[in-house]
Amino acid sequence: MSHLTPAKLPIGYTVSRRMADRGNKKEDLPRLDRLPTELPNPLAILTMAMKYAGRDPSVVLVSEGLGPKNWHGRVVIVTNEHTASAGEMVCAFAKENGLAKIVGAETAGRLIPGSGFKVGEGYRVILPKAAYVTWGGRRFEGRGMAPDIQVEWSPETFAGPEAPPLRQAKQLLMS
């Protein structure tokens, strides 16, 4: 998401039930504003795991503020019903901040971070750990994000460079 904007902007936040019940404000949550640029050594990974093990997962995500880039202002993101998880976070951040046009179909609405365990017969139970909320207050779990420009498609017409959503995205970029 940091590549979409030159500025440091709040992206969204996760909030656990415990933090929500306490009435904590998003502004008071710990901030994650930079991802490591180098792969840490195994000892650093172990140290980080021990530091954050059992910690409340509530955190604010903030873009890194990487400065101006050539592509800023001319970005189109293509979505469909399989766009989920971090893909929905990127789309929501871009849409809320006017950083890109979203073209295609509504996203999946599957965004809650969770952890799971096996229950046998090849099944897993996944339990939510926290809710994800965009900085503007929107939650997508169970209902996806509508694109700026809805483009109908079918599996037969979606393959290849002339798929309707890609054609629409190209038109937007060329105009």
Model regions and ranges:
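C-terminal "post-core" interaction segments
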Residues: 1-175
